[in-house]
Amino acid sequence: MNSFPWLTIIVVFPILTGSLIFLLPHRGNKVMKWYTLCICILELLLTTYTFCYHFQLDDPLTQLTENYKWIHFFDFYWRLGIDGLSIGPILLTGFITTLATLAAWPVTRDAQLFHFLMLAMYSGQIGSFSSRDLLLFFLMWEFELIPVYLLLSMWGGKKRLYSATKFILYTAGGSIFLLIGVLGIGLYGSNEPTLNFETLANQSYPVALEVIFYVGFLIAFAVKLPIIPLHTWLPDTHGEAHYSTCMLLAGILLKMGAYGLVRINMELLPHAHCLFSPGLIIVGAIQIIYAASTSPGQLNLKKRIAYSSISHMGFIIIGIGSLSDTGLNGAILQIISHGFIGAALFFLAGTSYDRIRLLYLDEMGGMAIPLPKLFTMLSILSMASLALPGLSGFVAELLVFFGIITSQKYLLMPKILIAFLMAIGMILTPIYSLSMLRQMFYGYKLFNVPNYYFFDSGPRELFVSISLLLPIIGIGIYPDFVLSLSVEKVEAIISHFFFR
């Protein structure tokens, strides 16, 4: 066990310091914004320092473990720890949240509450990724929903209450299945109930019971990921939410579903995962094509980007179902890659709305000349979204593609068919990405703003855009930087399916 509680400090620091926001003067919006930004930067630096100096990349076992008895009556432990699977999402969470707080500077209504909720969400997400106890994982998973619901219902478009209610109904419905699965696994078998990940990973279940547990967890994670047909909350939520909230939703929240699928369904329930993986691959391939063909019909800019997110999540599902080192590494790389790309696209969609007050593509046009910086950034990020070689999306999708082709678990003809469907999805992606650019930036200017002389991206917006773009280019050129974090852990997970 680790002697110094690094992870507890990392989890608790944002919400504890965030609660002090309410002690700052009400009129001091600027002070409060700088305070929130400083908390996020300090947290990111602390996380980076901890991982650089106290984490060994070549060790697939859980590191920095903390194990404190919390509630004696229930024998409930505060168990934290990280491995190669959780280190990437935790760093991604810190990076995206820091930039989202900077993106949220135009928010003036109830700004104190807004920034506190962002920091509370930050704590919940890091807690979910670093939990080593199933009940603690569930509590963090649920705790994180409260600030998300409030951010969606209080700031955003005219239908924000409808979209927030839809979001909470879907996620709360999924959480019921998650709770049943957690309690079922914890209470099964041994005389002493345990919820420790390490103990549960070595426990075996009757196949029928394992399948029941698997389905429960799958429904909960399918809502978050999302997997069709449980995806309908996502376009509505993205269409109405403030763009800094969209950055957190697209960049981190969806990835929690993928993380749960690998951490619980793959690691704890490998026999059931073997049975369900062909179905996951088929659903993933259908999802890529369905979302990519639905996206061009969306006139709302943010809804179009939301459907592109659903399509890209299909690659993660296929990677998880491929049961191969290459495929799972590709899925983890896609989690990180799409975190940056999705957050950047929603940020730029929001900044364009700030200027022209329009979200519908058929009302735009000719924006390239008055807004050249926005045009350049959105063009590059659209290329990243459609997996242009040299950018992170290309490497991730290519690894998933090779992962399914080289998988030893499937026959040749099904593999060729799935690869063909994935290729169709890759062809459909440029259609909605490039048509979005054409409708926004080319042709005649269709809109009238009260003041024709509106400004292009300022220094703050350029800084956020470039900060999101640099990792996309960096991962595209040198993907080993991310893959080296998870490769040992991935080998350990996949070995269960061949030697167990």
Swiss-Prot record:
Enzyme class: translocase
GO biological process, one term: ATP synthesis coupled electron transport
Transmembrane annotation, as ranges: 4-24, 37-57, 87-107, 111-131, 134-154, 167-187, 208-228, 242-262, 272-292, 305-325, 330-350, 386-406, 416-436, 462-482
Source domain of life: Eukaryota
Principal location listed in the UniProt entry: plastid
Protein's UniProt keywords contain NAD: yes
Keywords: Chloroplast, Membrane, NAD, NADP, Plastid, Plastoquinone, Quinone, Thylakoid, Translocase, Transmembrane, Transmembrane helix
Molecular-function annotations in GO: NADH dehydrogenase (ubiquinone) activity; ubiquinone binding
GO cellular component: chloroplast thylakoid membrane
Keyword Secreted belongs to the record: no
Topological type in the membrane: Multi-pass membrane protein
Localization in the cell: Plastid, Chloroplast thylakoid membrane
Annotated catalysed reactions: a plastoquinone + NADH + (n+1) H(+)(in) = a plastoquinol + NAD(+) + n H(+)(out); a plastoquinone + NADPH + (n+1) H(+)(in) = a plastoquinol + NADP(+) + n H(+)(out)
Any Pfam family hit: Proton_antipo_M
Enzyme Commission number: 7.1.1.-
UniProt xrefs under NCBIfam families: NDH_I_M
Family indicated by similarity: Belongs to the complex I subunit 4 family.
Protein's name according to its UniProt entry: NAD(P)H-quinone oxidoreductase chain 4, chloroplastic
Species this protein is from: Oenothera parviflora (Small-flowered evening primrose)
